[in-house]
Amino acid sequence: MLKQIKSDIYHLLHPKMAFFLTSVSKNDKPNVMTCAWATPVSEEPPVVIVCVSKESYTAELIKQTKEFVINIPTKKLLGALWICGKISGRDTDKFKRAGLKIIKAKKVKSPVIDGCVGHIECKVWKTVDAGECYAFFGNVISAYADEKYMRNGLWTKEAEIPLHLGGARIVYFR
């Protein structure tokens, strides 16, 4: 028997990859948040979309600077994922709090997170008002992955990519 879903409809589309979304302020102050709402929307040209709460500091920064980076972690960074998903970067240095090290990105000012196995650097092409979120369409400027964990365009089982099930539940891609 099928049950009517009235709230949390997005759970029907989970699991989703959990990742770090990095951004930067106009005066080059880096920021990071945990996110799971992203998807590719075009292969040619390569475009991804991330959806971020309008109330978040991250949304404010992305609207200002028109760029972001998707950083794909392994389960080794699970503790940092939880920290970066529970506090705001407005008044807290989440990188320091979560023990994350910043690396300079290849093509954008938003930082890359050391220890992640993949990175997608984006420039915002379009922003759409999407309910309580902004949907940021990002032109992919640069994308790269650790060849130890990605072969022939696919993640290996050793990558153990965290997948968000909804709420406080995470499983690992194997």
Question: Model regions: which residues?
Answer:
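Basic, polyanion-binding surface patches
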Residues: 1-174
